[in-house]
Amino acid sequence: MKTLRHINISDLHLSVYSEPTDYIDELMLIIDYIDKLKESIDVLTFAGDIFDRVYPANHKVIQIAVDFMTTIAERARLYDFKVFLLKGTLSHDNTQLDIFSSLESPNFHIVRNVEFIDVEGLLFRFIPEYYSNTYEELYEEALTTKADVTIYHGSIESAMPYAKALKADTHKMAQVIKDRDIIETTGIYTVCGHIHNRINIADNIWYTGSFSSHSFSDAGTKKGFDDITVDLDTGTFKVNFIENRYCRKYIILDGTDICKSTVKKMKAFFNDLKLDKKAKDIIRIDVDTNSYNDEEYKNLSFIMSSYKGIFQFKIERQVKTQEVKSIEEDAEYVLSPTIPLTHKIQKTIEEIYEVNLSVDRIKELLDISDIQKPTINDEIKEGVQVW
């Protein structure tokens, strides 16, 4: 049986970590896997969004990316496989893939525009995220020729419910490929980048998902890349998902019950959680405080300040009608142009410090004369100096 071995990696997003070097052990997972397969690999594709944002040339993310891709290019020459870097979203990759231009060779190619390339007898179609005024322009350039395999960065109609960043101007400009057009013009399979969830559009159309975790929307999901084997005799394929076991974990815990207990119990719980927490992982505690009394809410506030920087807290609290009314009344009082500043200060001091100062004493402290300065709506009368 003659086969083609295709590794697809999507949405690296170098670097979403505050410390870019945290990504190195994850990138080494890819290198180690290549070294394991060696000459059995035929093609390695990166399906867009190598970078998380645009970085200056001297940024350490750029250096990590160059070192990583240099290693990939060396392995491609050593084991004789093809590498294709597909340009992703404008706000992420932009023109930054050009920093890899010196690596380009018969084994290493940057795909900036729609291209059709033969790999081991299969026609690969590469479609970067496509920006145009009309869908017809995309269709004419990319979808009038049938391909065996399509590598695409962007949105497909059926994947739109999963797209999370469509409000961004760059995403509004990008075209969305219609399901029927990708189905009718791809013979074996289509694998996509751009959406970070791993989702199947059809049996032969799917999103690999991001290589690593990027936010709490990734909580509870596995990250990694695809190892695809194509039977060239039958045109069938199988996919083996390789998990990124080193990626950061975003963990969401329901803390409503534990955070209603005593400070002592909460400290014991969070201290144990702190000991079990890996350095890269981020844990969020979701707390519904609508049934909390004042003392319980106060205890929670103390715990939140005690573990600031270690855990994140998401608090759910419905503002009661009387609280809204009180806030509105306070706002009206503070913003009212008819109430003198001294009276506003008097009320604020009384509410916060429970001290009752007379208006005369406040004037004295502020060195205000008996002739009051005008309020906002006072008018300067002709011939009268009020300041």
Predicted regions and their residues:
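Beta-strand-turn-beta hairpins that frame and shape the catalytic cleft
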Residues: M1-I7, F116-F126, T144-V149, D203-I205, ...
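Accessory, non-catalytic peripheral segments of nucleic-acid enzymes
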Residues: K2, V230-W387
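Core catalytic region of metal-dependent phosphoesterases/phosphodiesterases
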Residues: K2-R5, V16-D118, I183-G187
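Structural motif
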Residues: H6-N8, T45, F126, V149-H153, ...
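Active-site metal-binding loops of divalent metal-dependent hydrolases
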Residues: S10-L14, D49-F51, T89-S91, P128-Y130, ...
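Short amphipathic alpha-helix with an adjacent loop that forms part of the alpha/beta core around
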Residues: I34-K36, D118, Y135-T144, M266-L275
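Conserved catalytic scaffold of divalent metal-dependent phosphoesterases
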Residues: F84-L85, T89-R180, F211
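Conserved beta-sheet core of the metallophosphoesterase superfamily
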Residues: Y162-F237
